[in-house]
Amino acid sequence: MELVIISGRSGSGKSVALRALEDVGYYCVDNLPFPLIAELASFLLASDCSAVVSLDIRNFPENLTRIDELLHQLSQLTINTKMIFLDCESATLIRRYSDSRRLHPLSNQDLSLASAIELENTLLDPLRQQADYLIDTTHSSPHELAANLRHILRGSTEKELNIVFESFGFKYGLSADADYVFDVRFLPNPHWHAELRAMTGLEQPVIDFLERQTEVHNFIYQTRNYLETWLPMLEKNNRSYLTIAFGCTGGKHRSVFITEQLAKYFQSRGKNVKIRHRSLEKYHKKT
């Protein structure tokens, strides 16, 4: 359980940082009023969860000694606190604001954009000095910033990919959220064996039947190799979920068995795997 404070110059990537850390499981709060940060820390301590809060010029305390007081208060709570400051060259910030056409938070003080950026830099310097980590985002893409933050906080630059293996029946329609769809209707069908018809791909007689089929083994082997070849690229693509769907006619036998086999294989390789049987859920509701 920890509290991460993200601060830095406006336009340096704080919003990107919050989205990236929310994707890896942190509870994120944007621009929480400064007096409430200690209350949030107490809540986290009681609930045993981790959070990220942004602190910028809009909620910066006028009395700078309050920052020291807050950090001391957090240390008394025995909460693991990290402060990360995002910096960026002024010329790059000017270009980013020109491209986005957004107003700088200090622009309402009758300052030019360049003057507002330099004033903010001066005001934030005490916070920069307190930071545990300083990240210069001048030449960083959003993906590179996200990877840098994951490395600092999780020890790994890669975002954990959640892989969903799901089965479905074509007669109920295609899986709407699937990234990959494999049609297994060409495989031997247990439905045509009266003693197996009422069963599902989770039951041993159906499993035994499908395991005896050479075509089934070949399909599993070749599909497994295909996925193993391209999963590393997908994991580097900064995505949170990958849904791989297998469809047979009714979503009751073949697709269920294939889904289970491949899900268990990748689970045994340390992947974060979930299994979903869409049409099987319909079947159980009917019965």
UniProtKB/Swiss-Prot annotation:
GO molecular function, one term: GTP binding
Cited Gene3D superfamilies: P-loop containing nucleotide triphosphate hydrolases
Positions bound to GTP: 56-59
Coiled-coil regions, chain positions: none
Pfam families assigned: PapZ_C, RapZ-like_N
Annotated binding of ATP, by residue: 8-15
Keyword Amino-acid biosynthesis in annotation: no
Keyword annotations: ATP-binding, GTP-binding, Nucleotide-binding
Signal peptide: none
Entry's family note: Belongs to the RapZ-like family.
General function of this protein: Displays ATPase and GTPase activities.
Name used for this protein in its record: Nucleotide-binding protein HD_0584
Native organism: Haemophilus ducreyi (strain 35000HP / ATCC 700724)
Taxonomic classification: Bacteria, Pseudomonadati, Pseudomonadota, Gammaproteobacteria, Pasteurellales
